[in-house]
Amino acid sequence: LRGPNYWSIRHPNLILMRLDLEDVAELSSDQIPGFYEALADTLPSLIEHFCSPGHRGGFLSRVRQGTYMGHIVEHVALELQTLAGMAVGFGRTRQTVEPGVYQVVFEYQNEEAGRYAARAAVRLCNSLITTGHYPSLELEKDPRDLEEFRLDGALGPSTEAIVRAAETREIGRAHV
């Protein structure tokens, strides 16, 4: 999504993913043996996610107490982008009328990176559920690939300065 939308006015660049959780649709994270530990070991930086409890570590406490996989995929997608140097933080997950299907929405800076982060987050969570770990080579590759997307889509220094000045003055802009 680009521009103000149903999900947010303040965060105009959003990935909207329709996620069918299949076998884990009715399981909360506390019902998956070893999932919390595997997630916290794989992405220890998730400790910085506040989530609804409103404090550092809030998201991981939700995972420990039990939250649904769509919510976890949202946070993992955001964290993978953060590890690649992209300042993102907005996300929402909502159940649809179709059982086991969720709408997962999260912010991106670079659209290709956002799409990649969505796929990588699903892959990472699925691996933790089925094997209890995420291969270290994959964990190194994902942020590296995301950083490449970020760098490929980055503005040059002079254009960046013009864009920041326009934003300060609340002048709209569009990437052409």
Region spans (language model):
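Preference for protein termini
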Residues: 1-175
